[in-house]
Amino acid sequence: MTTVPKNAVAKTLYQKVWDAHVVATPEGEAPIIYVDRHLVHEVTSPQAFSGLKVAGRKLRAPEKTFATMDHNTSTRSASLDALSPMARTQVETLAQNCKDFGVRLYDIHHPNQGIVHVMGPELGITLPGTVIVCGDSHTATHGAFGALAFGIGTSEVEHVLATQTLRQLKAKTMKIEVRGHVSDGVTAKDIVLAIIGKIGMDGGTGYVVEFCGEAIEALSMEGRMTVCNMAIEMGAKAGMVAPDQTTFDYLAGREFAPKGEDWAEAVAYWQAIKTDDGAVFDAVVELDAADIAPQLTWGTNPGQVVAIDGKVPNPLDEANPSTRASMEKALEYIGLSAGTPMTDISINKVFIGSCTNSRIEDLRSAAVHAKGRKVASGVTAIVVPGSGQVKAQAEAEGLDKIFIEAGFEWRLPGCSMCLAMNDDRLEAGDRCASTSNRNFEGRQGRGSRTHLVSPAMAAAAAVAGHFVDIRKPY
């Protein structure tokens, strides 16, 4: 918290960043805000670039636009021949658009290519106090740095490319404080799943959430990114964490971070970007970190989640008719019975990756449970690093060998099995322990059954063949 000068209005982190970016407030219309960084990929950008060409427009600030290929790329081969006809068209179109408009592109052959929400932060493109947008719903990831980051639609992508601005209504503010410290075996993924389980998948609708408290402050930047990544899964517009020394240490020396005197000046500014003492939030949610156990979803949205030592809930215990019906529908799709212990649920697929959990810390955590073990019979497990940098670092540490020797598949960077868009997808009836962010019906493939977990929980399930409590011997 920061102290407010006398007679000044106390502001939240979000309000400070918002106010610093309002360009104009036309009467009767949504405010116009400035965009500092625009991230694009091959799926949501083609129509936007086409619109610019039809209108004869150029990019307002091509140096503030960064492109990568991630959603529809192959994790088996870096060759265009490995792509489906549609995927190949998408990546080739992005390459041509970037060439035509002067946009920096990290294509499938670039050593820094990766998932947009992984490679952006590790290159220092993501900075505190900035506004960042991308045609992707999990852009909130970048809020871990104290940035205001959110997903936009394709028409908005075109608007930002042309003007470097965006019309936006100001959101309400929510503080989610996680007090105290977590126990061994509990990760950032468990924290955010517990939060969503508490407030529901629509509990954050209309809000920008600031995550705070000792448990959040103790997280690495990788952990904070995991938490902010899933802010959208509680319905929030964005998630943010105030920048601190952990943030500055992570950013120091990265390619697009300030250098020299600019660095010192930037840090001085960033240190002031935090919620003031006395600032009032529109809503406050509190959790005790000590109460959080490793989490595991049982249904078809991230809010349908319980602790690993719990059981599949019974819809009959739910008083709300709408919620009860939703639970019944979820159980029918997911193929589970009420009262089943979570540790009795067997799996046949494991996916460790996605913009939620594919960073080096995530892979290290999973490798602990893979080392010296073997993937269970009948289980297929894949590990997909989030970027070329993550892959190279993991291989330098020998993590790839640990996974391969245990029977995991070691892949190339990309969004992979998070969504059934590329070749990495589940078959009908497959049950997957996944480190991704969504467990909707068909998300990983038609008829697929997804259980969201941390990387450690996913790796443990791979070797056990079923979900286990990683806090105990298994």
UniProtKB/Swiss-Prot annotation:
It comes from Shewanella sp. (strain W3-18-1). Pathway: Amino-acid biosynthesis; L-leucine biosynthesis; L-leucine from 3-methyl-2-oxobutanoate: step 2/4. Belongs to the aconitase/IPM isomerase family. LeuC type 1 subfamily. It catalyses: (2R,3S)-3-isopropylmalate = (2S)-2-isopropylmalate. Keywords: 4Fe-4S, Amino-acid biosynthesis, Branched-chain amino acid biosynthesis, Iron, Iron-sulfur, Leucine biosynthesis, Lyase, Metal-binding. Binds 1 [4Fe-4S] cluster per subunit. GO terms for biological process: L-leucine biosynthetic process. Heterodimer of LeuC and LeuD. Gene3D superfamilies: Aconitase, domain 3. Its EC number is 4.2.1.33. NCBIfam families: leuC (TIGR00170), PRK05478.1 (NF004016), PRK12466.1 (NF009116). It is an enzyme of class 4 (lyase). It comes from the Bacteria. One of its GO terms (molecular function) is 3-isopropylmalate dehydratase activity. This is 3-isopropylmalate dehydratase large subunit. Catalyzes the isomerization between 2-isopropylmalate and 3-isopropylmalate, via the formation of 2-isopropylmaleate. [4Fe-4S] cluster binds at residues 355, 415, 418. Its cofactor is [4Fe-4S] cluster. The keyword Transmembrane helix does not apply. Signal peptide: none annotated.
